C-alpha cells in the first residue's frame, strides 16, 4: 500500500510539473489578455464590451494594436449604426405612442448617447489606420459574431409604438448590434447585402483590398454622421469630424468614379450643414 501511495504521489507530481511547464495564460492587463477578453466578449454577444477592450489595446503601440484597430473599425462602426437605428425605432414609437411617449424618449436619449460614443471610437480608429497602415491588403483577424444578418423581428414593436417588455429590451438591443456588426463586416469585405457570400469568405483567412475596406469605412462614417444632424443629436462639430475623416479616407485610395461620387456627396452635405 505504501508503494502504491508513493507511486500515486510521484505521478501527481509529474502531472503538476507538466501543467506548470505548459503555455501560461497572458497576464491581466497585457495586450494579449485584452485581445482574448475582446474575443470572449464578442463571441458572447457583448459587442460594446469587446469594443472597450479593443480601445484599451490601442492605448499603447504593441503587436496587437494594428489588428485591434482594423477590428474596431468594423466593430465600432456596426455598433454605432446599431444603436442609432434602434434609437430611430424608439423615436418612431415616441411619435406614435400617446400613452407614455416619455418612456420611448428615454430609450432614444440613452441609445443615441451610446451611438455617439461608438461613432467616435470608429472615427478615431479610421483616422489612425489611414495615417499608420499602408497595407494594400487588410487582414480581418476575427471571425463572425453570433446573431443574424436579418433585421430583428422584434424591432417592429418600438417602430410601431409598442414598448417591448422589460425582458425583451436588452435582447432586442443585442440582436440589433449583432445584426449591424454583421452588416459592417459584409461592407468591409465587399459582400454588402450578400451574407451568403460573406459566410463563404469566412471559411478561410479573410483579407480584403485596402480600397474596399476604406471605401466601406468612409461610407459608414458618412451614414453614421447623420446621428449628429439637427433632427437627432444636433452636434455639428462631431458631424464635421466624421464627414471630414470620411473624405480623408476616400482621398487616400484610388480615385474611382465611386470614390469621387461619394466625396462629392459628402462635401455637399457638409455645405448644407454649414449653411444652417
Placement of each model-derived feature along the sequence:
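Terminal, low-structured helical/coil segments at or just beyond the last alpha-helical repeat
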Residues: 161-162, 221, 227-230, 234-276
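Generic helix N-cap/helix-start motif at coil->alpha-helix transitions
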Residues: 26-34, 66-68, 170, 174-177
Amino acid at each position: 500500500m505504501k508503494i502504491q501511495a508513493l507511486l500515486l504521489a510521484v505521478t501527481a507530481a509529474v502531472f503538476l510539473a507538466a501543467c506548470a511547464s505548459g503555455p501560461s495564460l497572458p497576464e491581466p492587463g497585457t495586450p494579449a489578455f485584452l485581445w482574448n477578453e475582446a474575443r470572449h466578449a464578442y463571441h458572447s454577444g457583448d459587442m460594446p464590451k469587446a469594443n472597450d477592450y479593443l480601445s484599451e489595446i490601442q492605448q499603447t503601440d504593441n503587436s496587437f494594436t494594428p489588428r485591434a484597430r482594423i477590428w474596431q473599425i468594423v466593430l465600432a462602426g456596426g455598433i454605432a449604426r446599431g444603436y442609432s437605428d434602434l434609437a430611430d425605432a424608439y423615436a418612431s414609437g415616441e411619435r406614435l405612442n400617446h400613452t407614455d411617449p416619455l418612456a420611448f424618449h428615454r430609450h432614444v436619449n440613452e441609445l443615441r448617447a451610446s451611438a455617439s460614443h461608438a461613432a467616435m471610437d470608429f472615427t478615431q480608429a479610421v483616422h489612425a489606420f489611414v495615417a499608420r497602415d499602408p497595407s494594400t491588403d487588410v487582414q480581418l483577424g476575427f471571425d463572425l459574431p453570433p446573431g443574424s444578418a436579418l433585421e430583428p423581428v422584434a424591432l417592429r414593436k418600438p417602430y410601431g409604438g409598442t414598448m417591448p417588455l422589460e425582458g425583451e429590451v436588452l435582447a432586442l438591443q443585442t440582436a440589433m448590434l449583432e445584426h449591424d456588426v454583421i452588416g459592417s463586416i459584409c461592407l468591409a469585405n465587399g459582400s454588402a447585402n450578400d451574407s451568403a457570400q460573406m459566410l463563404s469568405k469566412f471559411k478561410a483567412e479573410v483579407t480584403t483590398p485596402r480600397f474596399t475596406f476604406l471605401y466601406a469605412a468612409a461610407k459608414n462614417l458618412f451614414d453614421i454622421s447623420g446621428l449628429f444632424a439637427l433632427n437627432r443629436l444636433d452636434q455639428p462639430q462631431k458631424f464635421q469630424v466624421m464627414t471630414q475623416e470620411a473624405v480623408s479616407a476616400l482621398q487616400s485610395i484610388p480615385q474611382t468614379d465611386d470614390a469621387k461620387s461619394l466625396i462629392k456627396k459628402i462635401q455637399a452635405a457638409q455645405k448644407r450643414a454649414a449653411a444652417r
